[in-house]
């Protein structure tokens, strides 16, 4: 399996408005597949914690054990600290760090979690090896990723299909490799996790599949934010689309979000491994 040099990926750029909208709906439910293996008193690390909306719920699950959330982005870590204070979560530590070089000694965690992280890395196996290093023998890891190449959208048209293709192009541009979300068990095994299991779910960027007018409006709005923001800028710079084509996609997304029969989901994949 191809695994480029760690750290060669381009950073995944997001719009602040998009981040606020999406992470407002990301909670501990995203780690439900790992929940049966968590116990009070465990020490847990959440890699790529973002603004902490999942991390604070994981901290509750392992209290009085410690939950540590790391993210490369200092701004995200600051937001996570604010959220933890607002919710009165005292057993969480949040800091800027790279999953490729975790600032922790070997065998220092009982559990690890990473959601929507591996898909943005040039070398997911290197990251998983580093997580395995800090897990105690028998420690558990849960990873989750969504497909960047497959979506289920109804109704559709060429402008919406072009938008979905743009997101796949962005992923490959950033990581230098094709999506491997179907290969989570293989990635875990290559990283040294001998026992693994995996499952599939349907998700949107903000939780379950969108099948009501309120939900499809939210999905359309979030997609348009990216289209008219950093992803649109990248698409023009790379020659993937013209500004006129981007606006046609945006208008198609808005119209789709208002359609009485609209539906949207994409495959999500989860996997668990034991060190």
Provide a role label for each language-model segment.
Residues 125-140:
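A short glycine-rich, Lys/Arg-flanked "PGG" loop and its adjoining helix->strand segment in the class I
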Residues 142-221, 225:
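Conserved catalytic/acceptor-binding region of the Class I
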Residues 24-42, 57, 61:
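Conserved alpha-helix/loop element of class I SAM-dependent methyltransferases that forms part
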Residues 16, 199-263:
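C-terminal helical/coil "lid" or tail adjacent to the Rossmann-like core of SAM-dependent
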Residues 2-26:
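Class I SAM-dependent methyltransferase Rossmann-like catalytic core
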Residues 110-124:
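A short SAM/SAH-binding and catalytic strip from SAM-dependent methyltransferases
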Residues 6, 45-47, 51-101:
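Class I SAM-dependent methyltransferase SAM/SAH-binding core
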Residues 100-111:
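A short acidic, Gly/Pro-enriched loop at the edge of an enzyme's catalytic core
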